[in-house]
């Protein structure tokens, strides 16, 4: 089953729906699971796999969705400063109401197009990298958002990482996977590949060559 937590940018707009499935609250958009309630009784699969290997001082979540990654980071490391970017105001509203994001005062939620936001932040950073961990979880209508693996976006993400920071990409295993990995490797050093259901989580560090 596909599990993709984040929305990316304008495109196909389906209303998010929250349901209880197998005793667990889930958010679906267009039939695809976008987020799950973090519960000690269940593994969180994809979102657990996206957590950085070491405790970050700060984190950026591109494609906040229902906030599973933010909740898991908080559970593991406490209230570290986080920024979550989510395109859809309806998803943000449900995440606050149904998934407890209002209980995370250390999480700053930005309702915006993640690509435009990253480009602006990278331009304004002027060499001052901001985040130890960045999670890229950007999907539209169940498909990887166009531009996620574009050279300009990848370079902007790298600019927002600290020199020893880590980025995690949530990819869908498909015939395009080898090409997608090559695109990432042009900008980052891939350190680990984690399989989670039909997803592949790519962990990488910025290249400095």
Task: Go through each PLM region and give its residues.
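Generic beta-structure capping elements
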Residues: 29-32, 136-139, 207
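Rossmann-like AdoMet
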Residues: 1-56, 75
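Active-site capping/gating segments
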Residues: 2-9, 176-209
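The AdoMet/dcAdoMet-binding core of the Class I SAM-like
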Residues: 40-163, 174-177, 185, 191, ...
